[in-house]
């Protein structure tokens, strides 16, 4: 049977899509490698808008202390260019490299950086669990997540035993806060009107609360988290740290903040926690402020794809879930709140405010 050119082109498109998905781990490996070699920081720290490939190869260093092979470095950089993380040019017949807007979020010691998220997500303890995704799909909601079956304990329990793992988790959350801070502060302006005390439940090292009390100095801020988290937290002006179990007791405040907490749990645990939060705020003017993802199943944008990726991550590694608007409505109603509102912001999460 004769194959028409249009069909050949369409089949080639399908093949290309499958090959890209087959080799999908290359993206994550290349990104991690670029950070390990310090490629993005080397370009940024040069003080020039672009540097030659020769200059780059002389600056970056391999974790094994071996010298960099320029030809292999070019092949890596060429792939980073396809990922829109490096821009390749030419000057005096020599290849040059420069940062893109995307890679500027992968620099160390910057106000906005997601580098610690990369290091946490791609660490060996996380990667090995992905090999058990098929088992995770068949795991009932009332059974421990696959992460616990692989490592013997859940992520929070391991964080209490291994300081390096605890640091990895909390540095990742601080990294996310650095990126979402402007949108958070802008989105919380009206919400925090009249609020004089705020407690961040499961607030880690307090980066989010530090930003809030800096922007709203009239607020008395506190963070409650597990003892090993609080012990490792740095001192932050205007932020009080409280050791405790958030499922047992939450200090009273005008408002409670839950940032990336509820997505770690199934509905039963979330309802119990939300009820605790509801008890901690005034019945007449209290607020429970949730910062979490809201998935739109009808949206096929790159943002939704990122949210769905995180949904599978929390399913596989923590036993939780990301939620749609309908999911949030049901969860908040089951927790006994009278009403809620969802406020989109210019960041991955939305702000969800539940009123007693």
Curated annotation (Swiss-Prot):
S-adenosyl-L-methionine binds at residues 173, 177, 202, 225, 245-246, 259. This is Probable scoulerine-9-O-methyltransferase OMT2B. Keywords: Alkaloid metabolism, Methyltransferase, S-adenosyl-L-methionine, Transferase. Pathway: Alkaloid biosynthesis. The keyword Nuclease does not apply. It catalyses: (S)-scoulerine + S-adenosyl-L-methionine = (S)-tetrahydrocolumbamine + S-adenosyl-L-homocysteine + H(+). The active site is at 263 (proton acceptor). Coiled coil: none annotated. The keyword Methyltransferase applies. GO terms for molecular function: (S)-scoulerine 9-O-methyltransferase activity; O-methyltransferase activity; protein dimerization activity. Gene3D superfamilies: Vaccinia Virus protein VP39 (3.40.50.150), Winged helix-like DNA-binding domain superfamily/Winged helix DNA-binding domain (1.10.10.10). InterPro entries: COMT-like, O_MeTrfase_dom, Plant_O-MeTrfase_dimerisation, SAM-dependent_MTases_sf, WH-like_DNA-bd_sf, WH_DNA-bd_sf. Belongs to the class I-like SAM-binding methyltransferase superfamily. Cation-independent O-methyltransferase family. COMT subfamily. PANTHER family: O-METHYLTRANSFERASE. Pfam families: Dimerisation (PF08100), Methyltransf_2 (PF00891). It comes from the Eukaryota. GO terms for biological process: alkaloid metabolic process; methylation. Its EC number is 2.1.1.117. It comes from Papaver somniferum. The gene is OMT2B. Substrate binds at residues 176, 260-264. Methyltransferase involved in the biosynthesis of the benzylisoquinoline alkaloid noscapine. Catalyzes the conversion of (S)-scoulerine to (S)-tetrahydrocolumbamine. The heterodimers OMT2B-SOMT3 and OMT2B-6OMT do not possess 3-O-acetyl-4'-O-demethylpapaveroxine 4'-O-methyltransferase activity.
């Amino acid at each position: 049977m004769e194959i028409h050119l249009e069909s050949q082109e369409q089949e080639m498109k399908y093949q290309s899509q499958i090959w890209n998905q087959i080799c999908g781990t290359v993206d994550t490996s290349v990104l991690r490698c670029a950070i390990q070699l310090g490629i993005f920081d080397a370009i940024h720290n040069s003080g020039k808008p672009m540097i030659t490939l020769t200059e780059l190869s002389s600056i970056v260093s391999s974790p094994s202390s071996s010298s960099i092979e320029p030809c292999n470095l070019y092949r890596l950089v060429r792939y980073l260019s396809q990922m829109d993380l490096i821009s390749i040019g030419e000057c005096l017949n020599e290849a040059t490299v420069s940062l893109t807007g995307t890679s500027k979020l992968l620099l160390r010691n910057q106000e906005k950086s997601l580098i610690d998220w990369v290091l946490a997500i791609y660490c060996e303890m996380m990667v090995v669990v992905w090999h058990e995704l098929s088992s995770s799909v068949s795991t009932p909601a009332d059974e421990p997540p696959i992460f616990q079956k692989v490592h013997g304990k859940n992520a929070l329990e391991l964080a209490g035993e291994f300081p390096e793992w605890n640091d990895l988790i909390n540095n990742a959350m601080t990294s996310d806060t650095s990126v979402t801070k402007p949108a958070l502060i802008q989105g919380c302006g009206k919400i925090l009107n009249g609020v004089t005390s705020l407690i961040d439940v499961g607030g880690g090292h307090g980066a989010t609360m530090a930003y809030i009390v800096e922007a709203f100095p009239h607020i008395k801020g506190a963070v409650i988290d597990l003892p090993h988290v609080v012990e490792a937290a740095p001192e932050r002006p205007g932020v009080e740290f409280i050791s405790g179990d958030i499922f047992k007791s939450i200090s009273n405040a005008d408002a409670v903040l839950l940032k990336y907490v509820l997505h770690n749990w199934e509905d039963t645990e979330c309802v119990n926690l939300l009820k605790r939060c509801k008890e901690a705020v005034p019945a007449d003017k209290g607020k429970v402020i949730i910062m979490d993802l809201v998935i739109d199943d009808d949206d096929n944008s790159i943002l939704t794809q990122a949210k769905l990726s995180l949904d599978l991550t929390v399913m596989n590694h923590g036993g939780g879930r990301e939620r749609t608007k309908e999911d949030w409505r049901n969860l908040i109603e089951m927790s006994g709140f009278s009403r809620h509102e969802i406020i989109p912001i210019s960041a991955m999460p939305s702000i969800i405010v539940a009123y007693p």
